[in-house]
């Protein structure tokens, strides 16, 4: 078995893992204590050639709840492509599932 190389692709950061969710199927869980407004990573990126978005593993497994503990922030990357990052709304305990409210706020 090859040893881990920090330059290998890692679908989730070391402070996150996938696990069975009590909300729905598989969810994303913290493997460490996380502070408020902590950037958990990219969930989606706009790919103009595809005329749509690519979802990362982080974006694919965060479950919905009305009492979410995370939120999304839209940013522009180095090529001015739209990317979305997941941030914590409050301190997250080790073992806690990370959640989003999928409903868009109505203007």
Where do the PLM segments sit?
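Conserved catalytic SET/PR domain of SAM-dependent protein methyltransferases, capturing the structural core
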Residues: 1-107
């Amino acid at each position: 078995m090859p040893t881990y190389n920090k330059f290998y692709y890692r679908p989730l950061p070391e402070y996150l893992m996938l696990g069975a969710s009590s909300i729905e199927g598989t969810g994303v869980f913290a493997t460490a204590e996380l502070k408020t407004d902590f950037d958990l990573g990219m969930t989606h990126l706009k790919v103009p050639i595809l005329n749509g978005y690519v979802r990362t593993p982080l974006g694919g497994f965060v479950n919905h709840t009305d009492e979410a503990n995370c939120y999304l922030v839209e940013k522009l990357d180095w090529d001015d492509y739209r990317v979305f990052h997941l941030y914590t709304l409050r301190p997250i305990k080790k073992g806690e599932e990370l959640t989003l409210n999928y409903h868009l706020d109505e203007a």
